């Protein structure tokens, strides 16, 4: 009688372990495309990511680089004071988007150009992640009055 209880307990523990591992794997698989890593322009230039990798880049819109093309096409460079990365974006820019202001973009780095699929302009801490502030402070270009 004891061996049947012991065997049943082992089966339940094994089944629970398999279920836990399976659910963890499914959650990880589902989240893999939803996680966007943050990089500063210096990090992008030091170690360029794969063209298939979606990530976020943040910094200041470099002065004198904002060019509006036909339609909603826009080209500019984002800098952290140490490096600049050219950015292209097709879409409507946020109202507060301008040169020498903070921005965060989501997209891919292809052939030396960051192709943004989303641009957020900084107007408060909601749009300026701590990583961007830290990167700008590290480069010595962050202004406290900007936040």
Swiss-Prot record:
What ranges does the Cytoplasmic topological domain annotation cover?
1-9
What is an annotated GO biological process for this record, any one? cytochrome complex assembly
Q: Does the keyword Cell inner membrane apply?
A: yes
Transmembrane ranges, per UniProt, are: 10-30
> Which Pfam families does this one have?
CcmE
User: Which ranges make up the Periplasmic topological domains here?
Assistant: 31-147
Gene3D superfamilies noted in UniProt: Nucleic acid-binding proteins (2.40.50.140)
- Indicate whether Repeat appears among the record's keywords: no
The record's annotation in InterPro entries points to: CcmE, CcmE-like_sf, NA-bd_OB-fold
Annotated membrane topology is: Single-pass type II membrane protein
Which residues does the record give as heme binding sites?
123, 127
Q: Which UniProt keywords apply?
A: Cell inner membrane, Cell membrane, Cytochrome c-type biogenesis, Heme, Iron, Membrane, Metal-binding, Signal-anchor, Transmembrane, Transmembrane helix
Please give the chief subcellular localization of this protein. Answer: membrane
Q: One GO term of the cellular component aspect?
A: plasma membrane
What is the stated purpose of this protein? Answer: Heme chaperone required for the biogenesis of c-type cytochromes. Transiently binds heme delivered by CcmC and transfers the heme to apo-cytochromes in a process facilitated by CcmF and CcmH.
UniProt xrefs under NCBIfam families: PRK13254.1-1, PRK13254.1-5
Indicate the family of this protein.
Belongs to the CcmE/CycJ family.
Q: What is this protein called?
A: Cytochrome c-type biogenesis protein CcmE
Give the gene name.
ccmE
